[in-house]
Amino acid sequence: MRILVIITCIVAVATATKTCEANEELVSCHNTCEPQCGYTPKACTEQCIMNTCDCKDGFVRNSLGKCVEVSECTKETTKCPENETFFGCGTACEATCEKPNPTVCTKQCIVNVCQCSKGFVRHGLRCIDKKDCPK
């Protein structure tokens, strides 16, 4: 009898319907590169986490785990990668190793984005110290 109760509990937990939070939807295969406040991970593993809640289209996940519109991202709810800083209005012409001082640039505001911190430049997916750029 005890084993039957345990098996019933295991089956109930395994087949339970997951409830998603506001602005989320249940997906059969979760994308581990889910867009977040400030950035979308570009280097991530390809794996499928089944029956998980993803942010609905048009929403991103903040550092508190909530799905919000990009306009709702703030410095406090955004966790930027190493050597990056949150900008409410970032540049469309971020400095890179190849172009450390971009001169020709359209005036665009990239809203609520993580970009390289002062003294760092973009090199591939990361921000590195200017002096560490390949020669």
Curated annotation (Swiss-Prot):
Single GO MF annotation: serine-type endopeptidase inhibitor activity
Alphabetized PANTHER family for the sequence: RIDDLE, SERINE PROTEASE INHIBITOR SWM-1-RELATED
Function, as annotated: Serine protease inhibitor. Probably by inhibiting serine protease tyr-5 in males, prevents the maturation of spermatids into mature motile spermatozoa until their transfer into a hermaphrodite. Also required for efficient sperm transfer and thus for male fertility.
UniProt organism field: Caenorhabditis elegans
Disulfide partners: 20-53, 29-48, 33-44, 37-73, 55-67, 80-114, 89-109, 93-105, 97-133, 116-127
Gene: swm-1
Residues bearing glycans: 83
Keywords, alphabetical: Cytoplasmic vesicle, Differentiation, Disulfide bond, Glycoprotein, Protease inhibitor, Repeat, Secreted, Serine protease inhibitor, Signal, Spermatogenesis
Assigned GO CC terms: extracellular space; secretory vesicle
Broad class of where this protein is predominantly found: secreted
Protein name: Serine protease inhibitor swm-1
Expression tissues: In male, expressed in the vas deferens cuboidal cells and, in posterior body wall and male-specific diagonal muscles. In hermaphrodites, expressed in posterior body wall muscles and spermatheca.
Subcellular location: Secreted; Cytoplasmic vesicle, Secretory vesicle lumen
Signal peptide region: 1-16
Keyword flag Transmembrane: no
Effect of residue 80 to Y: In me66; severe reduction in male fertility caused by a premature activation of spermatids and impaired sperm transfer into the hermaphrodite. Seminal fluid transfer and trans-activation of hermaphrodite sperm are normal
Stretches assigned to the TIL domain: 20-73, 80-133
GO biological process, one term: spermatid development
Keyword Repeat among record annotations: yes
Pfam families: TIL
